[in-house]
Amino acid sequence: MPPPPEPRQIKRPRLSLSCIVCRRRKVRCGREHPECANCVRMKENCVYKTMVHDEFTGRVRQVSPPPVPQGDNPNGPEFCANNSEERTGGFTWSHWMSQGSGNVLDLSDEAPLPRPTISPASAPPPQKRSTQAKCDASSVPHPHHSSTILTPAPSSHPQVDLVYPTVPSWEEAIQLPDNHHASSRAGTSRTSSVSQDASPAVSESARAPSTSTSYSGLPSPDYLSVRRGARVRYIGQAFWGLVAGKETLSDDFFDCNRDASMEQSLTHISSLGMFNLLRSLPTKPVSDALLDAFFFAVWPLSPLVHGPTLRADYDNFWEWCRNSDRALPPEKVRDDPTFLCLLFAILYCGASAAPPTSWACTNLQSLRKETTIKHLKSAYTTSLSLCQHLEHPTLNTLVSTLLTAPFLDRDVAPMRNMVSVSTTVRIAQSMGLHREGTWSSSLSPVDREIRRRAWWYIIGLDVQSSISTGLPPCYATEALDIVSMIADTRDEDIGDLSNHRSPEPVPRPSEQSLAVILAIARSETARLQSKIVSRLQNGRRLAQTELTELVTSAKKLQQKLDTLIARVPSQGIPEKGFIPSRLAKASPLYQTPAFSPYVWFCYRHYGPLQCVFLILVYLHTFPESGDIVLARYCIDEIIDHTVSHYQVPQDSFGATRADNSESDEGATEDQIPLAIQVLVDLHNRLQSHPRSDNQTTDRLDGNEYQFSPYSLELGIQGTEEDTIDKSIFSLPSLSSSSSRTHIHRNQEAPSTTTAPQMPSGTKHGPPSSVFVADSDGGSDLDILASLSDFETWSSSLVVDPSDILAHPTSMAPHHPV
């Protein structure tokens, strides 16, 4: 007898999470809020029904907002609190807290948020407001109402442990002893002195958990998911979870995208830790001075932030700090708290690169430089840890790591630097910086430009790391032709750029930026260098056609660089030998105090040392070259400067390095690195190499410049009896004419005895063919051209030894950057 059939199991009704339009059309809904991708594409009004599951009846019912009783006072505290929550979308600072962490703040106390400019001891006492004042419709809703505390729904994410690392407050930091290391340490949450802002207005970008572009009828080649909190995630076609036409479904495969709707908090950020970190900010005058130092000493070499936008956000942030007890934080800070990481990074870079003249100003003269740098470094690293940069990167945190890397990782070994660079490349790729699809049009012009600058900056780091270690680059060569080059315009004009930029005429002098010109030159050079390195690393023999292509590319690059150099404003007619008198008396840049703000850049990159090695090999291979005098002089200057950095105490502008010794963890500064020792040995071998009698005109000064791996002997300066054959000491002209430039320097300065002999009454100095001058005040941007020359020189040596020398240039002071 067959068994009786089992009774049909009654399934519990499921909650419908799709929007009404998709349910009516019977299509899969992406369930994005506030509008799904289907409704956006079809231009439909996307509406969701709020459904709940009744635990007692097992039924699913729609939730409707409760009516307001007529007898209730519309101005009462309950109505006012609920109304303020509705106006602000129900999003409060407590949304950044994890419900299961046990550290939900009690916002019933109306103590104001900490002001970075006021000492905790002098903070005003808490004040109570009347019910009528709280419910005044014309006033900003105060965030501190116990009835408006909203806690996030349980999440599948591991909750953030609010036992966060802390740093001292600014008042405590400036009183720390010199031997105190302001390192991150474990601490407990201090809720008594910090209160959270509630009910901030949510921006449109924050309301949308995912911003994507769907294309009717055609699958998108790639996909960029933009989430609240400025988090972006690039998803390529090779990803296993990407289905053509269903791109939004792949969002849920990434932890950074799950539960990222308006109702959920940013569980990966410790809001309490970030608020406590505000106590570590310097005062407003000190921050202003450090910001100016950043734009003066760091931004010209690394223009990775949009100046006008940064200054506007900076002013809005400090305006809120002055009124934090009655105003909401700026919208950008609410939507993207990683702005604090960028702020601390900029202040730390400004303090590290600030010249001695900046520390002598009124706002900084009372501070200890070493203590200030240590404190800001600790605050920056703590902010990066609180935001979990590696797991949830944003453009702010990525730019912060690029800006601070030269100061945090000084004198690191090439292999350690390689690991750091490879991690940075992968983070940039996960954010889609290596691609520019049709989805890039949804980004703002400023974001698109900063993404390009950051990507080409990373390309330069990767190619330098590849050359230093002999390993292949971390990216594919195809990415070099996908991302557009940096826009050749000032930051003030970036907002006016079109989405599809076409070739434009050369900007007028008033519309160009010297910092951007340098960035373009470095990016173009890095593009060619990476192609050469990638080709040499593929293991195949270089064919003649490939060599011809590389040589052609190098010549095109040289033309681009010449065009950029010609746009640098100049005074006089330097190509014909007419230069300002102050430039005729100029001393080497590294011996000039005006050079001190940019010393950090030279020791971060191996580019100049690689050029020295290439030139040394060239001199050994072609001892009878007509360029030997200029090449020998360049080598002597670089080795002199590099070796003296490690052995000669620097009590002026070199103090920047001494003050940053805390970042040289594990480095022995009194010992020359092995790579530099090898170059010094090669230099000594070159000097001791015997020469034939027919090379007497090429011989450098007889007083040999003696180097040893652990000692440095300064040479003897030239005398008035020094002479030189002008037929040897000549430079290629910027034009096709046969004119030559002869430089005369009368200012006494330490120099190497291996420098070329000069006519009577002059001293040694580097030749140059382009000089720029505005005034006699000195230049703080001269180093930019020299670094560009080194890269150009390196490219010329690698590809075409017969045309070794590019045009050395100098950039001038006081031009707008």
Swiss-Prot record:
- Where are the compositionally biased (Polar residues) regions? 146-158, 208-217, 748-760
Spell out the SMART domains in the cross-references: Fungal_trans (SM00906), GAL4 (SM00066)
**Could you tell me how this protein is used in biotechnology?**
Yanuthone D is an antibiotic against Candida albicans, methicillin-resistant Staphylococcus aureus (MRSA), and vancomycin-resistant Enterococcus.
Annotated region of DNA binding: 19-46
Q: What happens when the gene is disrupted?
A: Leads to significant down-regulation of the yanuthone D gene clister and losses the ability to produce yanuthones D and E.
Report residue spans for region: Disordered: 102-161, 180-218, 733-775
Molecular function terms from GO: DNA binding; DNA-binding transcription factor activity, RNA polymerase II-specific; zinc ion binding
**What keywords are assigned to this protein?**
DNA-binding, Metal-binding, Nucleus, Transcription, Transcription regulation, Zinc
Q: Where is the composition biased (Pro residues)?
A: 113-127
Domain of life according to the entry:
Eukaryota
- GO CC annotation terms, alphabetical: nucleus
Localization of this protein: Nucleus
GO BP terms: DNA-templated transcription; positive regulation of metabolic process
The family database entries (InterPro entries) matched by this protein are listed as:
Sec_Metabolite_Reg, Transcription_factor_dom_fun, Zn2-C6_fun-type_DNA-bd_sf, Zn2Cys6_DnaBD
Q: Does Transcription regulation show up as a keyword for this record?
A: yes
Q: Where is the composition biased (Low complexity)?
A: 184-195
Q: Which PANTHER family does the annotation name?
A: UNCHARACTERIZED TRANSCRIPTIONAL REGULATORY PROTEIN, ZN(II)2CYS6 TRANSCRIPTION FACTOR (EUROFUNG)
Instruction: State the protein's purpose.
Output: Transcription factor that regulates the expression of the gene cluster that mediates the biosynthesis of yanuthone D, a fungal isoprenoid epoxycyclohexenone that acts as an antibiotic against fungi and bacteria.
Recorded protein name is Transcription factor yanR
